[in-house]
Each structure stands twice: as C-alpha cells, then as structure tokens.
Amino acid sequence: MSKHIFECIDAHTCGNPVRLILTEKPDLEGISMSEKRLDFLKKFDWIRKSLMFEPRGHDMMSGGMIFPPHDSKNDFAILFLETSGCLPMCGHGTIGIVTIALEKKLVKPKVEGILNIEVPAGVIQVTYQKKDKKVSWVEIVNVDSFLAEKNLSIISDNLGEINFDVSYGGNFYAIIEKQKNYSDLEDFKAEQLISYSREIRDKINKKYSEKFIHPYLSLIHI
C-alpha cells in the first residue's frame, strides 16, 4: 500500500473553506492549464477525492495547487480542486489561494498589487492590497463572459417544468428567474434549495451534455 503525505494550508473566503496543497503535486502533461486539468482528472483524481471530500475536506471546500506559468509574462498558474471536479475557474478559490500565497510569500508578483494568473479557463487578472503581512482585499477580472443559450427547459421531479438560460463566466451556469413553478428563494428552505439545485443541475447535464462547449476552448464544456 502506497503512502502519501500532503502538506496543505487551510484558510477561508468569507467563511467558505479553501485548501492550498503545497507538496506531492503531480507532474502534469499539457501545454496549458486546460490540458493539465484533464491530465489530472485522468491520472490523479484520487488526490482531489482524498483531500476535498469528508472526512478531510468539506462539500463547500475549494482546493488548489500552484504551478509555474506557461507564459513567462504571467505570475503563476492554479489548478482548482472541488468536490464537484476540477473547475476551469473558481472565484472563491482564487481569492483564498491568492491570499495564502501572498501572506506566506509563496509567490513573488512581477508588479506589486497585480497578478496575472493562468487557470484552465484562461488568464485572469487579480488586483490586491497588502498591509504589512496581511492581504486586506482581492479583486478579480475574470475571463470573458457570454450568454451561451436561452429559453431552455427541463422537468424537475420536485418543481415541474423549469425554464432557464445558460451563461458562461469561467464555468457554465444555469440562470433561473422567477416563473410559474419557481417563485423566489425566500419561499424555500435552504435544504430544499440545495436538493433541488443538484437535481436540476444533473438533469441539465444529462439532457444537454453535448450542447455547452466553449466556442474556442473545446476542452471546456458542461
């Protein structure tokens, strides 16, 4: 039986847990973080499952690994690890990982106050303010967003027919507005919203699995 010891730093983004993995990072194949993301999922997904899932992790945890950039103009690269997979982009994870990396001096910005970071979805720009040894705030300029599809529908076991649009902003997101079978967040309990959201997500993925592919980043899809 093989034995692996991972050194990590845990933090949080407004209460949402973040875990930066420092050691035992795999040697990934690929010329971009998008390609390396797929290589990780193919060969090393056990790392994600071991560190993100309970008992070591949490359903809301965002994890990540820092890698050297592929383009020397950028500062570094991030691979995101979540319970749901390896997201092409994660704002929660970015804010937490950047904060850890700066406060622990794990990265050296090329320009103080600005970081250009490679993620599987592309290159994001992060601005931050650091006072003494602490990061006081982090802002992100994300990859280009766009409306992918509109006026789609699925049949929910709990709510009936649900109409939605799909937008892209580093990941594909289903946007559900008020409608006949869905009134508002305030009309449901938190556990209902979590359960219904998962069911709706799974039905969208099953029905439209081949529909949502990034127009020029074919490795990014639903």
List the predicted regions and their residue ranges.
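A glycine-rich beta-to-alpha transition motif near the start of alpha/beta enzyme domains, typified by
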Residues: 1-158, 162-165, 174-220
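Glycine-rich ThDP/TPP pyrophosphate-binding loop and its adjacent helix/strand module
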Residues: 170
